[in-house]
Amino acid sequence: DELNKKVDSDETISDDGVVAHGASMDEKHDYMDNGVRHVHNGRTRRKGSEHEVDGRFTPMEARLVFHLTTPPCTESVLWVVQKDDDEHHTRREEGPHWHDTHSFKHAEDLDVHLTPEDDLEDDKRHDDTYTYEGSLTTEEVQVEGYKDEPEELEMVDNWRPAQKNKVTVYKASEH
């Protein structure tokens, strides 16, 4: 579900009552060191959920792996690995909308790590392979992150007209 309604500083809630808790995505992170976030989300009043975070029961857990390009660009690629009703769902989200509109905080259980693999297909440019080793409630899963499109070069508009050499122009002050 699209989370689009901010409740307070540590949770985000959608129109149908799904709440997400996790780490802050309001700042730029380094790709290898800080590019993974562990988020719990679900209906806060639902008892018997698989997770309890800060006294709240949450039925779904998600792992977000994102890549922020060179600052000041905020374009990101997110891999979402979540467990709901004993099934794994993997979804890829691209674009700056997650980075700009979501605020997740208080996630310390960052147990997803990046594992580069050498035997991936050579005809695609891969960023890395993301491996989650599993927990008591979630089986291990591995997702290969690919980008089919080439990296775009940013052009800077720094053109200016030719300047005259050794010429100083003085203008009279009106005051």
UniProtKB/Swiss-Prot annotation:
Positions contributing to substrate binding: 137-138
Uppermost EC category: lyase
Tissue specificity comment: Sclerites.
UniProt PTM comment: Glycosylated.
Known regulation of activity: Inhibited by diamox.
UniProt feature, compositional bias: Basic and acidic residues: 24-36, 115-129
Residues annotated as signal peptide: none
The enzyme's E.C. designation: 4.2.1.1
Catalytic activities: hydrogencarbonate + H(+) = CO2 + H2O
Compositional bias per record (Basic residues), positions renumbered to this chain: 37-46
Binding site for Zn(2+): 38, 40
One MF annotation (Gene Ontology) recorded for this entry: carbonate dehydratase activity
Gene3D superfamilies: Alpha carbonic anhydrase
Cofactors: Zn(2+)
Residue span of region Disordered: 1-52, 85-104, 115-175
Similarity remark: Belongs to the alpha-carbonic anhydrase family.
Protein's job: Reversible hydration of carbon dioxide. Also acts as a structural protein, having a role in calcium carbonate crystal formation in the bio-calcification process.
Protein name: Carbonic anhydrase
Organism: Lobophytum crassum (Soft coral)
